[in-house]
Amino acid sequence: MITNESIVAEIVTDIPLSADIFRKYGIDFCCGGNISINEAVKNKKVDAETLIDEINELPNHDQGNINVKYLDAPSLIQYIQSRYHETMREEFKNLSPYVTKVAKVHGPNHPFLIQLQDLYRQYRDGMLEHMAQEDEHDFPALIKLSRGEQVDHSSDIIQSLVDDHTQTGQLLEDMRELTSQYQPPSEACQTWRLVYHRLMNLERETHEHVHLENHVLFNKFS
């Protein structure tokens, strides 16, 4: 049962579709998700009762019929890699030329698009480096740890990943603010609108990705 004291991150773990509701009201459920409903609604355009009612109307099942909470660490890592790492690498490759084109064509009259391109590149490059580090070093170390094997500096590994997630979250917030919540101006061309739409999708995917690691995977080692 969800109450005013229920923790946002735990709600999203149990009811993944609730992420859409938290996102709608600008409530962080990944890096800042370890807060209660009461804390989360402060300074937001929703009260706790309304938020709880909306969540309670959702079906209580995982998207894709995979209840990630009950996966062991190796299985969850494999899920994260196939569901997020592979798809995000592909999307970065496909989206980047459009971001460059919009900045080049419209940047002279809309300088914030050049700034958006810079933020996007920081976000993309940081995520690509982060995912490579996870795949090549950190995830294999966590799998060893889950099997009871000795891993040096295991707490440092997790803290470093959490710190990376926090930096990524700030870049996503900066891009959203710069683009007026991804609302294109009336004169925006189709490519401009496409970039905004796909950046919003990447933001959603990244939030879900980070939530799974911060609040499900890493909790298995606490």
From Swiss-Prot:
Keyword Methyltransferase in annotation: no
Residues in coiled coil: none
Pfam annotation, one family: ScdA_N
Cell location: Cytoplasm
An example Gene Ontology molecular-function term: metal ion binding
Domain of life: Bacteria
Gene Ontology CC annotations of this record: cytoplasm
Entry keywords, A to Z: Cytoplasm, Iron, Metal-binding, Stress response
Entry annotated with the keyword rRNA-binding: no
InterPro entries: Hemerythrin-like, RIC_family, ScdA, ScdA-like_N_sf
Chief place of localization: cytoplasm
Entry's Gene Ontology BP terms: protein repair; response to nitrosative stress; response to oxidative stress
Binding partners and assembly: Homodimer.
The protein's name in its UniProt record: Iron-sulfur cluster repair protein ScdA
Organism placement in taxonomy: Bacteria, Bacillati, Bacillota, Bacilli, Bacillales
